Amino acid sequence: MKLEDFAAYNRPQSKVSDERKFLDYIHSRNRWVEFIKSIDNAKPVSIAMKNSFHSQWVESGAFIREKINDDSILLKLLTLLLPTYDGDSLVLYRGGENKDRFDKGLIGFCWTTDISVAEKFGRGLNAYKSPGLLLRAEAPACSILAGPNAHSRYLGENEFTVNPSRLSNITVIETYPDNSFFK
């Protein structure tokens, strides 16, 4: 191996914004609820903060949801911090649900227009300790909080964040077996 072979690994990294550093601080200390209270009814959130949060949501949405542990509070956070969607109604798919959560009415916020992406999530980690589900829903424009950002498109996920209570005609297309190693 030559020194030149390492050039691709030694490329300059993009600068982390102050907004992202702040959000990482909030996330690492599980201070989301306090943060929501501090911005509620305050001055409007900057575009830079919304874009930084959107990237963090794409990367860590499941963990943020788990840390907040209250979908009504999470919905408030998403409504305040995500860039506003300005598009048409869509048919969306979700594979990020397992049967236990679905049966409890806990439907997730992240959906895609690409059924193959939803299938991947339905068969994967989301089929842990319970069968995975592939869902289809009609999403009126008013139900979509944010469309895909550049990072989501780069990952090939084309993730739309929605208010699940505003979706209609949610149907289970397929059920995948529980992939837990130990049952």
Pin down the residues of each PLM region.
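Conserved NAD+-utilizing ADP-ribose enzyme module
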Residues: 1-91, 98-109, 115-183
